């Protein structure tokens, strides 16, 4: 029983942290702050899924955690490229069809 209380407490803390990051995404003074906050939300979502997996004793949620991690990484990479170059996909001027 104390183990479940610990997991539920950790779950509440992570969810409150996600809400704080959501405020940073909405109010963030710069685009870089918003990108970092979105990345943090992705990591916290992975933690929430892991804690629910432990609490409910579901083993196959590891695949979902990995997919969320991959999507969070790709989102951060795309936003970083957009911030650096102003566009995500660079078109070559010699590549005309």
Curated annotation (Swiss-Prot):
Compartment(s) where it occurs, according to its Swiss-Prot or TrEMBL record = Cell membrane
A GO CC term assigned to this protein in UniProt: plasma membrane
Q: What is this protein called?
A: Na(+)/H(+) antiporter subunit F1
Q: Name one GO molecular function term.
A: sodium:proton antiporter activity
Q: Which InterPro entries match?
A: MrpF/PhaF-like
Q: What does this protein do?
A: Mnh complex is a Na(+)/H(+) antiporter involved in Na(+) excretion.
Q: Where are the transmembrane segments?
A: 3-23, 35-55, 60-80
Q: Which NCBIfam families match?
A: PRK12600.1
């Amino acid at each position: 029983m104390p183990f479940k209380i610990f997991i539920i407490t950790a779950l509440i803390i992570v969810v409150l942290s996600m809400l704080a990051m959501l405020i940073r995404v909405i109010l963030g003074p710069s685009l870089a702050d918003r990108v970092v906050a979105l990345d943090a939300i992705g990591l916290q979502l992975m933690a929430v899924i892991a804690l629910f997996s432990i609490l409910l004793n579901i083993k196959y949620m590891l695949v979902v955690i990995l997919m969320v991690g991959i999507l969070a990484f790709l989102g951060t990479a795309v936003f970083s490229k957009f911030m650096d170059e102003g566009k995500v996909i660079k078109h070559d001027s010699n590549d005309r069809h």
